[in-house]
Amino acid sequence: MSASPPLVVITGPSGVGKDTILDLLREDLSNVYVPVTATTRKPRLSEIDGVDQLFYDNEGFDSLIKNNSLIEWAEVYGERYGVPKSQIEDARSLGKELIVRTDVQGAFSIKEYDPSSVLIFISPPSLESLSHRLEFRGGITVDQIQSRLSAAELEMEKADLFDYVVVNETDNLEGTINVLKDILIDLGFSLKNN
């Protein structure tokens, strides 16, 4: 039996399509597990605690930090997010192939935790296209869009520190998924038999 593939970290600016990409990749990968992150933000209407996120109040999240239960955590847009160690350790003990979705700083923290991890940065084709995506997605103000674009610019400056950079071209999601599948297959991830 071959060695299990490395932990893969996928990150990129807000609005670049990380969640959509991960949802589509999960359809094609047979043994993948995407850890559920802990957060202090309130659940969205359709979200389920323990499935979409692990929802904590501030006191509960503080306890996770105090007990060193998170691989990494950060405050993002006024809410805290983190990756529980138990999510990684439990999945590994079951032989799962891991893809973690986090922010740029979290990616570097995970690399410190697991130096063999592989970091993939999902980039928009341009800041202008990212702005259009954020506007189309809705639910955030013009000021919030500007804040996210400023953060995206700083994040994109760090893209060359990643093992792979994949551009999520507008109107070519299938192409993005195919590039990522090729990377994951090369790393040893298992595809479903279709």
Regions picked out by a protein language model, each given a short descriptive name:
Residues 27-35:
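Post-Walker A helix-loop "phosphate-sensing" segment adjacent to the P-loop in P-loop NTPases
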Residues 13:
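P-loop (Walker A) phosphate-binding loop of NTP-binding proteins
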Residues 39-98, 105:
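ATP-dependent small-molecule kinase phosphotransfer cores
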Residues 19:
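Walker A/P-loop
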Residues 98-103, 112-136:
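Conserved phosphate-donor/acceptor-positioning beta-strand/loop module used by diverse small-molecule
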Residues 16:
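ATP-binding Walker
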Residues 136-140, 154-194:
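NTP-dependent small-molecule kinase module
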Residues 10:
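Hydrophobic anchor at the beta1->P-loop junction of P-loop NTPases
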